[in-house]
């Protein structure tokens, strides 16, 4: 299948979150549950982003399309900066008393010593392409539905920036996969592994943080449950329609029309959108 993605160059942008100022323990509307749902996925980002970079870079020399080659380099730049920015938040969680090192050690061991060492390169790339599809759906929902309006400004800026750039490079890993290993069974295998790993690690991280949060039990659960019900559509689209969409043989990430959404957000904060490539 040929690529239908817009020929845009993902533009790496610098963002240095200011975590010197105190960050509220429950920075998402003062509620523990949504805070730790997002804290949980934040713990997954740095190791995940580096896995994605290596999975695509392995095949870079086999990409004979000069435009896709440049898009991949933009992808590396964006994902590398995402990893650094999200990793800087770990010190905030540690300062708040959360013990995250053991979780991170296990998570990285499974990702790097398990999946990355055992799975063949093509399967790692297929997992990456599927994960990029999931994160692009999350990114679109974050921007379109203003999911983070109740979040602390520093975290909101970090996550909105990340969301916009995820949309910009949403098709890069998929296009590389279609160039070097255009197998539908391989794509499906990558999807199944990605869905299991993302959901499993995310639930584990969120549960670990909630377990350590002594104030969680003292809060009224009603407002938190209502908020999560209101936002349930965002997560259900990832593991429901998102999976069904990816299983279509003619699927391509560009079929989700959300590039302008990312460009509009970036322009609203004074950042230049992705540039067109010839």
Task: List each language-model region with its residue ranges.
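Non-heme di-metal
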Residues: 2-278
């Amino acid at each position: 299948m040929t690529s239908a993605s817009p020929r845009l160059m993902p533009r790496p942008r610098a963002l240095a979150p200011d975590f010197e100022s105190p960050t509220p323990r429950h920075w998402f509307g003062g509620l523990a549950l949504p805070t730790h749902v997002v804290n949980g996925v934040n713990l997954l980002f740095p190791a995940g982003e580096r896995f994605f970079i290596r999975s695509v870079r392995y095949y870079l020399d086999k990409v004979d399309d000069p435009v896709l080659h440049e898009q991949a380099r933009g992808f590396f730049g964006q994902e590398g900066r995402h990893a650094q920015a999200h990793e800087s938040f770990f010190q905030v969680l540690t300062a708040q008393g959360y013990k995250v090192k053991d979780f991170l050690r296990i998570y990285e061991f499974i990702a790097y010593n398990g999946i990355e060492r055992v799975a063949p390169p093509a399967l790692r790339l297929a997992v990456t392409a599927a994960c990029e599809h999931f994160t692009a759906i999350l990114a679109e929902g974050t921007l379109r539905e203003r999911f983070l309006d109740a979040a602390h400004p520093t975290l909101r800026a970090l996550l909105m920036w990340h969301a916009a750039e995820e949309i910009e490079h949403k098709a890069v890993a998929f296009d590389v996969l279609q160039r070097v290993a255009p197998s539908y069974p391989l794509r499906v295998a990558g999807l199944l592994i990605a869905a299991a790993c993302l959901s499993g690690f995310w639930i584990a991280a969120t549960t670990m943080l909630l377990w350590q949060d002594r104030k969680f039990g003292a809060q009224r659960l009603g407002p938190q449950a209502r908020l999560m019900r209101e936002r349930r559509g965002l997560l259900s689209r990832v593991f429901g329609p998102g999976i069904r969409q990816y299983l279509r043989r003619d699927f391509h990430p560009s079929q989700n029309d959300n590039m302008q959404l990312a460009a509009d957000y970036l322009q609203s904060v004074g950042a230049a959108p992705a540039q067109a490539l010839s």
